[in-house]
C-alpha cells in the first residue's frame, strides 16, 4: 500500500492502463457524488467487504478512496492481507478531491 497525495494519485492514475478506482464510502456518501468510473464497495460491510474484494482481479492496480483517507487506508491494508499487491490510498479523500466528479 502507498499513501499518495491528491496530485500523485491523479498523475499515477492517469498513466496507469491497469487501474481500477475503488470507492469504499457508504452508499449515502456515494449518492452525494463520486469519482467517475469508480467501483463501490462499502468498507462498513465488514466480512461482506472482504467477500466482495476477493471477487476483484488481484492483478490490477487499485486506487482507493473514502471521504478523508482513513477508511481507504484500512481498505488498502485489508486488500493487501488477502493478496492484492498494488493498492494506493488517496490522502485527504473525496473531501479534498479536485478532479472530475459525478453525481
Please give the residue ranges for each predicted region.
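Rhodanese-like catalytic fold shared by cysteine-dependent sulfurtransferases
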Residues: 1-20, 27-61, 70-103
Amino acid at each position: 500500500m502507498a499513501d499518495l497525495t491528491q496530485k500523485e494519485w491523479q498523475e499515477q492514475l492517469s498513466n496507469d492502463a491497469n487501474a481500477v478506482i475503488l470507492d469504499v464510502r457508504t452508499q449515502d456518501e456515494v449518492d452525494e457524488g463520486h469519482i467517475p468510473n469508480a467501483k463501490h464497495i462499502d468498507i462498513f460491510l465488514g466480512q461482506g467487504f472482504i467477500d466482495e474484494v476477493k471477487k476483484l482481479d488481484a492483478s490490477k492496480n487499485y486506487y482507493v478512496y473514502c471521504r478523508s483517507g482513513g477508511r481507504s487506508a484500512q481498505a488498502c491494508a485489508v486488500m493487501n492481507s488477502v493478496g492484492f499487491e498494488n493498492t494506493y490510498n488517496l490522502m485527504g479523500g473525496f473531501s479534498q478531491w479536485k478532479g472530475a466528479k459525478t453525481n
